[in-house]
Swiss-Prot record:
GO terms for cellular component: cytoplasm. It holds the Pfam family Mur_ligase_M. This is UDP-N-acetylmuramoylalanine--D-glutamate ligase. PANTHER family: UDP-N-ACETYLMURAMOYLALANINE--D-GLUTAMATE LIGASE (PTHR43692:SF1). One of its GO terms (biological process) is regulation of cell shape. It comes from Neisseria gonorrhoeae (strain NCCP11945). It comes from the Bacteria. HAMAP family: MurD. ATP binds at G117, S118, N119, G120, K121, T122, T123. Coiled coil: none annotated. The keyword Chloroplast does not apply. GO terms for molecular function: ATP binding; UDP-N-acetylmuramoylalanine-D-glutamate ligase activity.
Length: 445
């Protein structure tokens, strides 16, 4: 792919957009920058990084009317809008940073492990990266997990990696056509981002783009959407919490198995919750697909401590355990967190619902929850979706109030779980900030 003298507009000026500007400029493109809202201080900040960079703001159509050949989109901007469709129909090319990386690794021959899914993808990406590093591979962990892929590539100055471990969101996959992973997985499909997609099937089709090429498919045998993603002629490894598969959980013994072979006991896995057994099985299958030895992988699984804000015990007071799952930003993630915990629960839900249907939480909560506390802008919708299923629902103005009220009702042996099933931006700077407030509220009890 050549960019020499190509007029290129980079849309969206967060971390991904900045990395695309840097990469495209280095490769000879004539780059301009666009954001729907640009403050003077942001222009000055970016201008110091890129001498002579031209900025556009306001309507995207007005910017595109300046004769651009390529539109490089940040993940937060959907290409499903009339201005971008018209640009493509007039011969313009639309791509994102993952497509740019795909061109690099395809030419250079780097191996790629690609991970997506509604829930669990960050944990699996981190675990796979950890295992690859522990097994001695020169490993790059990047994508939706935090470091933009082109920022990582520029830092390496073109040096080939043994393996790239990529967490990919559906947004990143929308305009990715050339990525051919050595191994890939879609961990699961549940309602998320339905404010961006037509329906759940549309969302699943976008996720399935991760399986292009002829690499190993690692499939969740318990998920109907994932089962349907099997491609003819491909090597497939299936994992299951429900029945025998290539990798499966024997419920009676709590042992992860491959066929009849015992792999590891769930008691030896530091990560809490049954859903993390699925994460471990997927991670081992992905790592084996790039040639790593099973015995070493299983030993290193035992030392992986997981990620903050993902079903993380933060403390205990008078026998009541407090668990932070602030990263549970959709219904599927929260249902998985609830399913993986055995003790009676008081659950804190709410925030920005992103157009989700919360009724699946009725079944998840009904046999586990002693009480549910609702916060945030979409608390009324959650109440409507859960009303009438026998749950004790309490509206709280703040997260601090929810923590205090839950603790007042809890008894020794109970769990207070923050797993909001919603985005956080109505009340907090992000899920990490929401977690900080939860922890401080616990400490104040």
């Amino acid at each position: 792919m050549t960019f020499q003298n190509k007029k290129t507009l980079v849309a969206g000026l967060g971390g991904t957009g900045i990395s695309m500007i840097a990469y495209l400029r280095k490769n000879g493109a004539e780059v301009a920058a666009y954001d729907a809202e640009l403050k003077a201080e942001r222009v000055a900040q970016i201008g110091k990084m890129f001498d002579g960079l031209v900025f556009y703001t306001g309507r995207l159509k007005d910017a595109l009317d300046n004769g651009f050949d390529i539109l490089a989109l940040s993940p937060g901007i959907s290409e499903r809008q009339p201005d971008i469709e018209a640009f493509k129909q007039n011969g313009g090319r639309v791509l994102g940073d993952i497509e740019l990386l795909a061109d690099i690794v395809n030419r250079r021959g780097d191996k790629v492990i690609a991970i997506t899914g509604s829930n669990g993808k960050t944990t699996v990406t981190s675990l796979v990266g950890y295992l690859c590093i522990k097994c001695g591979l020169d490993t790059v962990i990047a994508g939706n997990i935090g470091t933009p892929v082109l920022e990582a590539e520029l830092q390496r100055e073109g040096k080939k990696a043994d393996v790239w471990v990529l967490e990919l969101s559906s947004f990143q996959l929308e305009n990715t056509e050339s990525l051919r992973p050595t191994a890939a997985t879609v961990m699961n499909i549940s309602e998320d981002h339905l404010d961006r997609y037509d329906d759940l099937l549309d969302y699943a089709h976008t996720k399935a783009k991760i399986f292009r090429g002829d690499g190993v498919q690692v499939l969740n045998a318990d998920d109907v959407f994932c089962r349907a993603m099997k491609r003819a002629g491909r090597e497939v490894k299936r994992f299951s919490l429900e029945h025998e598969a290539d990798f499966w959980l024997e419920r009676g013994t709590g042992c992860l198995k491959q066929g009849n072979e015992d792999l590891i006991s769930t008691q030896d896995i530091p990560l809490q919750g049954l859903h993390n057994a699925a994460n471990v099985m997927a991670a081992v299958a992905l790592c084996e697909a790039v040639g790593l030895p099973r015995e070493a992988l299983l030993e290193h699984v035992k030392t992986f401590q997981g990620l903050p804000h993902r079903v993380e015990k933060i403390g205990e007071k008078n026998g009541v355990v407090f668990i932070d799952d602030s990263k549970g930003t959709n219904v599927g993630a929260t249902a998985a967190a609830i399913a993986g915990l055995q003790n009676p629960l008081f659950v804190i839900l709410g925030g920005m619902g992103k157009g989700q249907d919360f009724t699946p939480l009725r079944d998840a909560l009904k046999d586990k929850a002693k009480g549910v506390f609702l916060i945030g802008v979409d608390a009324p919708q959650i109440r409507r979706d859960l009303d009438g299923c026998g749950l004790n629902l309490t509206d709280c103005v703040t997260l601090e109030e929810a923590v205090q009220t839950a603790y007042a009702q809890a008894e020794a042996g109970d769990i207070v779980l923050l797993s909001p099933a919603c985005a956080s931006f109505d009340m907090f700077k992000g899920y990490a900030h929401r977690s900080e407030v939860f922890i401080e509220a616990f400490k104040a009890l």
